[in-house]
């Protein structure tokens, strides 16, 4: 599914942030990426998404064999990539549900499918909103406009549920969530998952992984994945921090 090989990327002044990332994600897997602040976790998601502030210096990223790095940003999304950001953007004046319908039909057009009928989209949206315990107030508001931090995170998972991506890269989805909101968001992610899909979770905390069980846990430090393991690795990091890890 997603293959990242020797990915190196820098910012405008030439400072290299990613220094050789290697990661293989297969269908049905959940990968958790943990690491100290400034280790390159958010940069990795932005580079995969095609953020213009970053330059890829070396390496490759493919999704189902397709070269993501050569694609326009919209084509990456339409090909099955979903990125949830640490700080979701507010778009005042753009209706939340209309935005979702437009995004979904854009993806369907890219895949050669007819637009989803209004009645069918309404039903789909209502089902996914109910799954995330979102009330009708979300329907008529601007995209993330005036939303609390927790509401923005929940709205991102609604977008993920509607767009039905092959692989989702969720950057600190648990940030700013209380226990109840965390439970709801995690339930939504688990409901969306299937044997054909995959998720990459960036998190600092074990508490998210109590709800969403990772297949693998990776430690990212100084722009490299320096250690990988199973769910037990996250528990050890929770107990001991990162200082015990030696770079190989």
Regions found by a protein language model. Give the residues of each.
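ABC ATPase NBD Q-loop/coupling interface
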Residues: 60-76, 144
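Conserved beta-strand-loop-alpha-helix hinge in the C-terminal portion
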Residues: 211, 220, 224-247
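Walker B catalytic motif
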Residues: 169-173, 180
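ABC ATPase C-loop
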Residues: 160-161
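Conserved structural motif at the start of ABC-family nucleotide-binding domains
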Residues: 2-4, 17-20
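Q-loop/switch helix immediately C-terminal to the Walker
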Residues: 83-87, 93-109, 121-124
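The feature captures the beta-strand-to-loop junction immediately N-terminal to the Walker
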Residues: 34-36
